[in-house]
């Protein structure tokens, strides 16, 4: 998915139902932390990119799907797939503020740039985009969609949200002022993880997203409101048996100069220059080798970055690990053990 690095405050905490397993330590301004959800477990782990070690762990969140923060860092928002709620935590005290009931199974979430609303994808038929007021912590609106939603990103200028639907095979663009669907792009395959490239004025220029049967990614021109091309990964090496869709996980580096796209079929992440979309290289990721079986992929998926653009993190779902990659040398520098099926990751930075 696209970079979720934002300037936030960070603190370890303990509260009813959620526990920081390792003691919280003072964190200096400008320090980054990588938050990792474990989709088949009950934990969210926190990694210090300076050491690539897990420094804290949140427990007792059943099927954590996604984690984001309020702009001022005062709240933590977590979608809870098992309970169909948005769990809201106080960042300073660690106490649970509220569990906000949702319309159905909670998937990805996003926070509007002004912090006033939390947007949650409902991955349950018939599908919806739930809007939660961040002041009252009440669901104030549920926008019906043609099918269940998977992932969501807010455009850099804060004017739109883009949500994708694997089952419905579309990407829907929502106007955040009117809180209504604005336009959509339909595909011949399921629409998966999106990333948004901004233009010089901060507005959305291109949408990069993965499709359910494409070992590569599609490119949508935001102004034209249409798909303009598809890019396939080079097929110069034997593939492994992918666990899931061929390609799942995409992100744009903080400086906007590179696009990183995961291939499950090749158990790799490919790097492209922006705005040219020219292939720069690839990084091989861990494979699973079971006795008596052909190698299978480690199911690489989600991506995040350190704010200095130096390190890229890729979650390896089947391998129960996250790979830390040096963005300059394109070499893996660490394999970080995680919980069951690591998934969405978010980078947080102290102001």
Language-model region placement:
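Bacterial N-terminal signal peptides that target proteins for export
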Residues: 2-20
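Short linear, low-complexity motifs centered on an aromatic residue
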Residues: 1, 5, 58-61
């Amino acid at each position: 998915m696209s970079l979720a690095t934002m300037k936030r405050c960070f603190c370890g905490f303990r509260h009813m139902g959620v526990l920081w397993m390792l003691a919280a330590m003072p964190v200096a301004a400008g320090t980054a932390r990588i938050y990792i959800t474990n989709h088949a477990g009950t934990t969210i782990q926190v990694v210090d990119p300076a050491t690539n070690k897990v420094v804290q762990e949140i427990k007792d969140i059943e099927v954590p799907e996604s984690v984001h923060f309020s702009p001022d860092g005062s709240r933590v928002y977590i979608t809870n797939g098992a309970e169909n709620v948005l769990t809201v935590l106080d960042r300073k005290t660690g106490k649970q503020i509220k569990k906000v009931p949702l319309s159905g199974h909670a998937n990805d979430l996003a926070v509007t740039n002004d912090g006033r609303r939390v947007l949650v994808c409902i991955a349950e038929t018939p599908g919806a985009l739930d809007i939660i007021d961040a002041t009252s912590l009440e669901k104030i609106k549920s926008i019906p969609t043609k099918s269940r939603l998977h992932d969501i990103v807010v455009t850099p200028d804060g004017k739109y949200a883009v949500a994708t639907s694997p089952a419905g095979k579309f990407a829907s663009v929502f106007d955040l002022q009117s809180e209504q669907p604005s336009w959509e792009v339909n595909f011949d395959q399921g629409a998966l993880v999106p990333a948004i490239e901004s233009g010089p004025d901060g507005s959305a220029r291109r949408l990069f997203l993965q499709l359910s049967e494409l070992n590569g990614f599609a490119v949508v021109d935001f102004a034209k409101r249409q798909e303009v091309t598809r890019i396939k990964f080079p097929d110069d090496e034997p593939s492994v048996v992918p666990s899931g869709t061929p390609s799942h996980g995409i992100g744009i580096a903080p400086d906007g100069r590179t696009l990183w796209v995961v291939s499950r079929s090749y158990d790799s992440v490919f790097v492209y220059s922006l705005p040219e979309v020219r292939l720069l290289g690839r990084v091989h990721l861990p494979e699973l080798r079971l006795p008596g079986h052909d190698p299978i992929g480690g199911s690489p998926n989600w991506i995040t970055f350190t704010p200095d653009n130096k390190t890229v993190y890729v979650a390896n779902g089947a391998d129960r690990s996250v790979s830390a990659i040096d963005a300059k040398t394109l070499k893996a520098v660490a394999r970080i053990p995680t919980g069951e099926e690591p998934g969405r990751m978010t980078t947080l930075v102290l102001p």
